A protein has these predicted regions:
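Hydrophobic helix-and-loop "lid/oligomerization" segment in the mid-to-C-terminal part
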Residues: 2-25, 32-62, 77-80, 160-288, ...
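Short alpha-helices
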Residues: 109-178
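An acidic intrinsically disordered interaction segment
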Residues: 1-7, 98-107, 127-135
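Active-site cofactor/cluster-binding pocket
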Residues: 65-121
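Short, motif-level signal for alpha-helix interfacial/capping segments enriched in acidic residues
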Residues: 2-7, 87-89, 139-141
Length: 325
């Protein structure tokens, strides 16, 4: 991982109040990073407002929704206020929160290679498996250690973005050392696992079954494609969307190099999630349509009907999975 830039430490030292903001449609790494950094800043004597546009549709982060404001609160405004944006590098990714953000200095902290960060401080480390590890590095660079509660948040985020360490390889010893620090500080891997994988509704399992049934092979099975319709979401509810396990099941199919799940947001707009093995750069495909993410996990929002979006995205896999690849 890259060292914490001195200008970020100076940025934190110079300001007294922080709007700690994450991306819309937050996940465990985003929420865990915000909660841990916010807690550390508070016990360092800083004012903190945690902001998220939501929605908190993932069951594992739903218990934390009440800790976040969907807007930047006016009462936190001060001359020494600043914003720290976590797990994304564009104000366009923070949703409606951006409309309430006053003209303050901004620091971006992210681990996605694709981005357009333009702030007073930009700390991007695409070698970091999770932003929570970058937050741990910031805490340590400021001479601190995470509390038990902060360690729980950080381990939760780390487990989220690494698939509970499934996505790590032999070059990941630094990550396991960091995880060991968090466990030593009181974080429980067992609690993190149950938070990530427990509490699912029966409806979510039924929706998963339908989505699996619809999966169709492309490129001789190297790409598996499925979708979730508006009718599905009306029938099973938004809280039933549980794509992480679905991706695992699809990628476990012999010969599968990538999985794509398309979710209708309206008749003219779809959210697309991509998961891949080493052969495919999902982040590059997503970026070509205005999205972003990592090589192995990425996403985007695309205008168009379900079939139109599906065929556009399937064609984008040609350089990786086509006959001439």
């Amino acid at each position: 991982m890259r060292p914490v830039p001195p200008e970020l430490l100076d940025f934190i030292d110079r300001h007294q109040t922080f709007y700690v903001i994450g991306h819309k449609e937050p996940d465990g790494d985003c929420v865990g990073s915000q909660l841990a950094l916010g807690s550390f800043l508070k016990r360092s004597g800083k004012g903190v407002a945690l902001c998220s546009a939501g929605p908190f549709t993932r069951t594992e982060i739903l218990p934390y929704e009440s800790r976040f404001s969907p807007i930047v609160p006016d009462e936190k405004a001060s001359e020494r206020a600043a914003a720290i944006v976590l797990d994304c590098s564009s104000l366009g990714r923070i949703g409606d929160v951006a409309q309430t953000l006053p003209p303050v200095q901004i620091a971006f902290i992210d681990h996605h290679a694709a981005g357009e960060a333009k702030g007073e401080v930009v700390f991007i480390d695409d070698r970091a498996p999770a932003v929570t590890l970058m937050v741990l590095a910031i805490i340590e660079a400021m001479g601190g250690k995470p509390t038990k509660e902060e360690a729980e948040y950080l381990l939760f985020g780390l487990c989220t973005d690494t698939g509970f360490f499934r996505h790590l390889d032999e070059s990941s010893s630094e990550t396991f050392l960091a995880a060991s620090k968090l466990v030593a500080a009181g974080a429980s891997p067992k609690r993190a696992f149950h938070l990530m994988n427990g509490g699912k509704s029966l409806f979510s399992r039924k929706l998963m079954g339908e989505t699996l049934t619809r999966a169709e092979p492309r490129y001789d099975g190297a790409l598996l494609v499925s979708y979730v319709t508006l009718e599905d979401q009306q029938r099973y509810g938004l809280a039933s969307r549980d794509s992480d396990m679905l991706y695992q099941l699809l990628l476990s199919v012999a010969g599968c190099e990538a999985a794509m799940i398309i979710r209708q947001e309206s008749e003219t707009e779809c959210t697309v999630g991509l998961r891949a093995r080493e052969r495919v750069d999902g982040g590059a495909i997503a970026a070509s349509f205005g999205g972003g993410g990592h090589r192995l996990a990425a996403g985007l929002l695309l205008r168009g009907g379900l079939e139109e979006v599906r065929e556009k995205l399937v064609a984008a896999f040609e350089p990786y999975l086509g006959e001439d690849s």
